[in-house]
């Protein structure tokens, strides 16, 4: 009944008020718009193929696409993405935690390639104290940088600055002080209107 009443996201371009473009649909019902609704990319996902399977398998799986508002092209990222994909603030990347691999991944929405963000870092990004039957969650994402130039990821103690393109080496911005002294560093955003973190704030 709820599905029958469901509405789907679309857009109307400025200057073309009578042209409505449907973005989401029955096959890809969930849409996340980048840039506070004004970005180039839209993340589309669907859990529908895995609803029955989810009754015994609690791991997240979603078929995932990116819609390019400029070219009006739909690009498939994966069927399924093993996780809960999200779109970065400026919309340049789709990212997710792969609980099976215990790694963070990102899909470059512009160049259309997937990058393992944490494979070369010699610490665990998964919750080492996980005591549930399911696969462990990540410690989380602290913030993205301006224009999605970097992402800050947590391990158990420290914060890592990672280039989602993969050109710059990962940097432990807390200098391993957290792990050395068993102190947990976390980023607290005191400005609710702030969508990203600037390099000067690090």
Regions found by a protein language model. Name each.
Residues 1-202:
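Beta-propeller folds
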